[in-house]
From Swiss-Prot:
Name of the protein this chain belongs to: Phospho-N-acetylmuramoyl-pentapeptide-transferase
Transmembrane region(s): 21-41, 73-93, 94-114, 132-152, 168-188, 199-219, 239-259, 263-283, 288-308, 338-358
Keywords recorded for this protein, A-Z: Cell cycle, Cell division, Cell inner membrane, Cell membrane, Cell shape, Cell wall biogenesis/degradation, Magnesium, Membrane, Metal-binding, Peptidoglycan synthesis, Transferase, Transmembrane, Transmembrane helix
Enzyme Commission (EC) number: 2.7.8.13
Major localisation: membrane
Gene it is expressed from: mraY
Taxon lineage: Bacteria, Pseudomonadati, Pseudomonadota, Gammaproteobacteria, Pasteurellales
Stated family: Belongs to the glycosyltransferase 4 family. MraY subfamily.
Length: 360
């Protein structure tokens, strides 16, 4: 929005031309999202306490979690607000990719909001019926994917980039829709499953979003895309603004979500952030890189799949409890140790993912 204002004001003062640079707007977006989160955080927490929107805890979970019962949840609304406002302020709203990102973010956020609200009103951990939850997640994902397919079905925007192989980039055709569906829905659920400890999901989210900001910038720059042997995608550079908004909002939320948490993001935050990371990976054609950089999310999701599958087939559990972060808690690891070690692993995976861009 401010891009258009700057284009007008530059006639009178050339300094406003700086706002046209994506790097300047990326930094300003991050700071805006961060400050909004820090500013509204105490107000949101107080309002959630007044409304008695408290966290419900699983009866079969670690005993240390019983103390968390009643902690304000649905704090993800301030993440969404921070991302939305900062993106609308600093992004070029003529770019269709921005609207696709916001559509998935708020679409999944709405699904998570309903899920959280049902848990709170029913005073248990059961939210939306699973089939309806996946139905609406699928609807949002497919609308976004078909929108993107229509925008770039005959360009590099639908090629599959494979790490380490610079000359292998097959055109996906209609399979683009199938792959993109599983990326968005899968990432949404994976981040949701990871969000079980104070700050566990939000820091990896910020790290992955920050890495995708760099990748989006390179993908939208003809020279860097050619240098790195990745597809040049016309609209992708503006996705940098959206990614840095996620980073800023996530860091702001972490201020209140760090152990011991004053607020939890709830499904309204975790589903939205997961869906957002998924759609960004699709936009910059780095689905495989998302698997590497978001390895913590992948392992958390796989631990649940393996646990459920093993119990149904063999009546035996692989882990003491799933997702896997609870397994380590039940082994005696203090919660802060689990969180920090998962953060370290996430940082290493993000750096490994970025390195693969050059090792091609």
């Amino acid at each position: 929005m401010l891009v258009w204002l700057a284009e007008y004001l530059v006639r009178y003062e050339t300094a406003f031309n700086a706002i046209s640079y994506i790097t300047v707007r990326a930094i300003l977006t991050l700071l805006t999202a961060l400050f909004i989160s820090l500013w509204i955080g105490p107000k949101v927490i107080k309002r959630l306490q007044i409304l008695k929107f408290g966290q419900e805890v699983r009866n079969d979970g670690p005993e240390s979690h019983f103390a968390k019962k009643g902690t304000p949840t649905m704090g993800g609304v301030m993440i969404l607000f921070s991302i939305g406002v900062s993106t609308l302020l600093w992004a070029n709203l003529a770019n269709p990719y921005i609207w696709v990102c916001l559509f998935v973010l708020f679409g999944y956020g709405a699904i998570g909001f309903v899920d959280d609200f049902r848990k709170i009103t029913r005073k248990n951990t059961d939210g939306l019926i699973a089939r309806w939850k996946y139905f609406w997640m699928s609807v949002v994902a497919l609308v976004a994917i078909l929108w993107l397919y229509w925008l770039g079905h005959d360009t590099d925007a639908t090629r599959l980039v494979i790490p380490f192989f610079k000359d292998i980039m097959p055109q996906l055709g209609l399979f683009y829709i199938v792959l993109s569906y599983f990326v968005i829905v899968g990432t949404g659920n994976a981040v949701n499953l990871t969000d079980g400890l104070d700050g566990l999901a939000i820091m990896p989210t910020a790290l992955v979003a920050g890495a995708f900001a760099l990748i989006a910038w390179a993908t939208g720059n003809v020279n860097f895309a050619e240098y790195l042997h990745i597809p040049y995608i016309k609209y992708s550079s503006e996705v940098v603004v959206f990614c840095t908004a996620i980073v800023g909002a996530s860091l702001g939320f972490l201020w209140f979500n760090t152990y011991p948490a004053q607020v939890f993001m709830g499904d309204v935050g975790s589903l939205a952030l997961g869906g957002a990371l998924g759609v960004v990976a699709i936009l910059v054609r780095q689905e495989f890189l998302l698997v590497i950089m978001g390895g913590v999310f992948v392992v958390e999701a796989l631990s649940v799949i393996l646990q459920v599958g093993s119990y149904k087939l063999r009546k035996q559990r692989i882990f003491r409890m799933a997702p896997i972060h609870h397994h380590f808690e039940l082994k005696g690891w203090p919660e802060p140790r689990v969180i920090i070690r998962f953060w370290i692993i996430s940082l290493m995976l993000v750096l490994m993912g970025l390195v693969t861009l050059k090792l091609r």
